Amino acid sequence: MPELPEVETTRRGILPHLEGKRVKAVSVRNRSLRWPIPADLAQQIQNKTLRTIHRRGKYLLLEFANGHVIWHLGMSGSLRIIKADEPPMVHDHVDIAFGGNLALRYTDPRRFGAVLWTNEAILEHKLLNHLGPEPLTDAFNSAYLFDKSRKRSQSVKTWIMDSKVVVGVGNIYANEALFNSAIHPLKAAGKLSQKQCDIFCSEIKSVLAKAIEQGGTTLRDFVGGDGKPGYFAQELNVYGRGGKACKKCRKPLTEKKLGQRTTVYCTHCQK
């Protein structure tokens, strides 16, 4: 699933090509995504100028004068810039054509993504109004993390992946940040010390920033706005390495399901 670094990589990749350009045409070949694509999407944005593209958590927000397109990549989706006359493949569900023979193409084999339209205040939208702070901003800090974790009995891994706590810390990066912080993923969130919160907060920011620099993590379907894969997979310490030697102590890494998500950790290095 594309996580925050992949979504931010996509935003940075497509924005320079499309910012300030006018929509010439909208082609929707399959409306049946996680939620149906609005029937009036073309009517809302055709001949309108794309002002900019924001990101909130894992959502991309395409800003027009009259509202926003809310885009979620789902489990297997990707957005890329193509020539407007490039023929679509079977999983290419949406094209938005702009001037200069450019188009934004949405590909989603599993169709768990979403393309929605709203003309309400964007941060008040029901998909966005409950979200926690962005992890790469000052609002997400160790004092916040320590305060928010008090009296929380759930495992720190499932807790940190809750978008009400902080957005965008998905499974890959939660595994990595916990390993780098030497924190056991099954540890109760409420048992984190202030020092552990200091380290954990720093490692979350570091892992996400490094992943963005590398263009995200491609494990299966993800490509960035330029059609290229992300390269952070080469930097992973634990995710996808269950049973292999820990890069620190060389003992085998443990893999198990936690909250229905694959969790990989070192029982020796993480306490």
Curated annotation (Swiss-Prot):
Cofactor binding note of this UniProt entry: Binds 1 zinc ion per subunit.
GO molecular function: 8-oxo-7,8-dihydroguanine DNA N-glycosylase activity; class I DNA-(apurinic or apyrimidinic site) endonuclease activity; damaged DNA binding; zinc ion binding
InterPro entries given in the database record: DNA_glyclase/AP_lyase_DNA-bd, Formamido-pyr_DNA_Glyclase, FPG_cat, MutM-like_N-ter, Ribosomal_uS13-like_H2TH, Znf_DNA_glyclase/AP_lyase, Znf_FPG/IleRS
Annotated residues for binding of DNA: H91, R110, R152
EC number of the protein: 3.2.2.23, 4.2.99.18
Catalyzed reactions: Hydrolysis of DNA containing ring-opened 7-methylguanine residues, releasing 2,6-diamino-4-hydroxy-5-(N-methyl)formamidopyrimidine; 2'-deoxyribonucleotide-(2'-deoxyribose 5'-phosphate)-2'-deoxyribonucleotide-DNA = a 3'-end 2'-deoxyribonucleotide-(2,3-dehydro-2,3-deoxyribose 5'-phosphate)-DNA + a 5'-end 5'-phospho-2'-deoxyribonucleoside-DNA + H(+)
Cofactor: Zn(2+)
Domain of life: Bacteria
Active-site residues, record numbering mapped to chain: P2, E3, K58, R261
Keyword Lyase carried by entry: yes
Pfam families: Fapy_DNA_glyco (PF01149), H2TH (PF06831), zf-FPG_IleRS (PF06827)
Zinc finger FPG-type: from-to: 237-271
Keywords, comma-separated and alphabetical: DNA damage, DNA repair, DNA-binding, Glycosidase, Hydrolase, Lyase, Metal-binding, Multifunctional enzyme, Zinc, Zinc-finger
UniProt record, GO biological process: base-excision repair
Role noted for this protein: Involved in base excision repair of DNA damaged by oxidation or by mutagenic agents. Acts as a DNA glycosylase that recognizes and removes damaged bases. Has a preference for oxidized purines, such as 7,8-dihydro-8-oxoguanine (8-oxoG). Has AP (apurinic/apyrimidinic) lyase activity and introduces nicks in the DNA strand. Cleaves the DNA backbone by beta-delta elimination to generate a single-strand break at the site of the removed base with both 3'- and 5'-phosphates.
Family of the protein in this entry: Belongs to the FPG family.
Subunit structure: Monomer.
Full protein name: Formamidopyrimidine-DNA glycosylase
Gene that this sequence comes from: mutM
